Amino acid sequence: VGFKAGVKEYKLTYYTPEYETKDTDILAAFRVTPQPGVPPEEAGAAVAAESSTGTWTTVWTDGLTSLDRYKGRCYNIEPVLGETDQYICYVAYPLDLFEEGSVTNMFTSIVGNVFGFKALRALRLEDLRIPPAYIKTFQGPPHGIQSERDKLNKYGRPLLGCTIKPKLGLSAKNYGRACYECLRGGLDFTKDDENVNSQPFMRWRDRFLFCAEAIYKSQAETGEIKGHYLNATAGTCEEMIKRAVFARELGVPIVMHDYLTGGFTANTSLAHYCRDNGLLLHIHRAMHAVIDRQKNHGMHFRVLAKALRLSGGDHIHSGTVVGKLEGERDITLGFVDLLRDDFVEQDRSRGIYFTQDWVSLPGVIPVASGGIHVWHMPALTEIFGDDSVLQFGGGTLGHPWGNAPGAVANRVAVEACVQARNEGRDLAAEGNEIIREASKWSPELAAACEVWKAIKFEFRAVDTLD
C-alpha cells in the first residue's frame, strides 16, 4: 500500500457513528465547544484522535501498526440542550492504550494533551465508564466502608469529624490539645487541614506525637475508638511514606493525603502502604475546583472521584449541598453513589452518563465538610445517610463554650437525627423541630443553636444540570 502524505480531516478516520462499543472499552463523555466554523463531527473526531493514536498529519509509521485496533473513536454526538455551540461527544478507547493499575497513565492519555487543542474553544470531560477488566487491575481503597466500621466499632450512624482551626499557626502542643478536647466531647475524628504539612511553627513529627497523645487519652476517657487524620502529604514520595510509617508506629488508625496536589502516583503508593499496614486513608481534594468548577472546560468532579476510587482512599471530601462550598444536590448524590455503591445505573438527571459496575472494588466514604453546623444536621443525615463523615470545623470550634462542648453539641444532634429517622420521622420536614427538642436536654446543643440560628450561605450553584 502506497503511503499518502498530507493532512486529512480527523473525521474521516476517527468519527465512526456505526461503531458498537465493547465491554472492555473505556468510554468518555466530553462536552465540546468547537471554534466557530468547526463542525461537531470534526471536533469530536479531533478529541478522539489527539487523546489516542492521531496527530495533525498522516505519518508513514501509521502503516507499521493497526490503527483500527488502537485508535479512539468518536461514536456518538449529542447537542447540549439550551446551548447553541456545545455538544456531548462520546469517545471509546481500546483497553490496550492504557497501562494496568495506573490512574496516572489513564489521565495522561485521555486528558493529557487534547485540552489545549486549537480547534476547540473549550473542552470538559463529564464522565468516564471504566470497564471491569481495567478496574480489576487496581487495588482501590485500602479498606473500604465495612472494614472501616469494623475497625472503629461504629455502626448505624454517620461518623463525626472536625478540622482543627486556625489551620496554620498553632504549636504542636496546642494543636494536640484542641484535638483532645474535640475527641473527648464525642467526635470520632479530628483532622489536619489540607495545607498542614511540616511548617516552621509545627513540624510533622511533633504534631504526630501530640495528636497520638490526644487520641489515646480521649479513648481512655470515652471507651470509644478515636482517630486524627495525620496529613502525610510531603514534597517527595519517600518523605510521605516516612510519615505514614511513623503514624503506623504510633499505632494511630488513619492518615491523610491531598491526592490532587500530591499526584496520583504518590496517592496510589500511599494507598498500597495503608492496606499493607492496616491504616485507613483519608483523602482531601485540595485543588479540585481549579479543574472542575468551570461548566464548559476542565473535568467534572465525578471523574476525579472515580479516579480516586481506583487509586485508593477510604474517605474523600465531596461537598455538602447545604454549606459554604459548591455542590448541587442531584449532582453531588450522583458521585456520592459512584463512590459508595457497587453498581450505579446511568442516570442523566444526576449527571451519570454511563452505567458503572465496580466489580467489588471497596467503596469510599464521602466526607461532607465546609460551612456546616448543628442546624444542618437533619439535612446532612437525610442526604448522605449513615455511610458518611460529617465534618464540622468552625461548627465545632466556634462553639461559645469551647471545643469539647462544641463536639458534644454535634454528637447530640447527630444521635437525635438518627433516632428520629429510625422512628420514621421526616428529617427534611421536621429537622428544625428535632434539633429544638434535643436542645432542651442538652445545654451545649442549645448554645450552638443560638449562635448559628441565622447563618446561611445563599448563592446559586455554578455546577447545575443542563
From Swiss-Prot:
It catalyses: 2 (2R)-3-phosphoglycerate + 2 H(+) = D-ribulose 1,5-bisphosphate + CO2 + H2O; D-ribulose 1,5-bisphosphate + O2 = 2-phosphoglycolate + (2R)-3-phosphoglycerate + 2 H(+). Mg(2+) binds at residues 191, 193-194. The keyword Disulfide bond applies. One of its GO terms (cellular component) is chloroplast. The modification N6-carboxylysine is found at residue 191. The disulfide bond which can form in the large chain dimeric partners within the hexadecamer appears to be associated with oxidative stress and protein turnover. Its EC number is 4.1.1.39. The active site is at residues 165, 284. Substrate binds at residues 113, 163, 167, 285, 317, 369. GO terms for biological process: photorespiration; reductive pentose-phosphate cycle. It is an enzyme of class 4 (lyase). Binds 1 Mg(2+) ion per subunit. It holds the Pfam family RuBisCO_large_N. The record marks 324 as: Transition state stabilizer. It is found in: Plastid, Chloroplast. Keywords: Calvin cycle, Carbon dioxide fixation, Chloroplast, Disulfide bond, Lyase, Magnesium, Metal-binding, Methylation, Monooxygenase, Oxidoreductase, Photorespiration, Photosynthesis, Plastid. The modification N6,N6,N6-trimethyllysine is found at residue 4. Its cofactor is Mg(2+). The basic functional RuBisCO is composed of a large chain homodimer in a 'head-to-tail' conformation. In form I RuBisCO this homodimer is arranged in a barrel-like tetramer with the small subunits forming a tetrameric 'cap' on each end of the 'barrel'. RuBisCO catalyzes two reactions: the carboxylation of D-ribulose 1,5-bisphosphate, the primary event in carbon dioxide fixation, as well as the oxidative fragmentation of the pentose substrate in the photorespiration process. Both reactions occur simultaneously and in competition at the same active site. This is Ribulose bisphosphate carboxylase large chain. It comes from Ruttya fruticosa (African azalea). The lineage of its organism: Eukaryota, Viridiplantae, Streptophyta, Embryophyta, Tracheophyta. The gene is rbcL.
